[in-house]
Amino acid sequence: MLETLEEARKELIRVDHLVYVSLKYTRTVDMIKHAIKRIISSYDLLNEALLLYSKENKKILEIPSTPVSKRETLMELFKEDEFILKNVMLHTWLRKVDKIEKYKASREFRKHVTMTLELEGKEMKVDIEKIYEYYNLLQGYNDYVKKIIIGEKEEE
């Protein structure tokens, strides 16, 4: 569980570099896609850590193997926790965005580079500001999950 948290921290460092260095200077939709993949990877690790924590505390018997069942388990375990639910839903939405192959790039190599795609019948725009927003939510989620897991360890 602590190893998974450490992996998540390292992945968060990679996301930080992507967002504040690579994306800032490259300004392409490919970099937006890459940042989304890294954010998803970080969420995967943090959610895995929460599931390991739940298993260790005997709230679940085993950790689900598929992303959908992991999401459902987390939503059931933490149904009272709005912050976790919000982040689990964002993670799910980002996974859907990542799977979309057809998107339009506009204003590449400029400040307002935008990836436009259609998701569930709606046109969605993802730009650098949105990536910053997702990254900030991810940082908050990382701190929150760490507090849940490590905070419990310190109390014992």
Residue spans for each PLM region:
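Charged alpha-helical initiation segments
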Residues: 1-34
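Generic recognition of short, well-ordered alpha-helical interface segments
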Residues: 3, 10, 37, 41, ...
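A generic "alpha-helical surface" signal
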Residues: 6, 33, 37-40, 129-132, ...
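Amphipathic, well-ordered alpha-helical segments in soluble domains
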Residues: 11-18, 38, 45, 137, ...
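Secondary-structure edge/capping motif, primarily at the C-terminal ends of alpha-helices
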Residues: 15-26, 49, 53-56, 119, ...
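N-terminal interaction modules that seed assembly of large macromolecular complexes
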Residues: 24-60
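Long, charged low-complexity segments
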Residues: 57-140
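Long, hydrophobic alpha-helical segments that serve as membrane-spanning/inserting helices
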Residues: 134-156
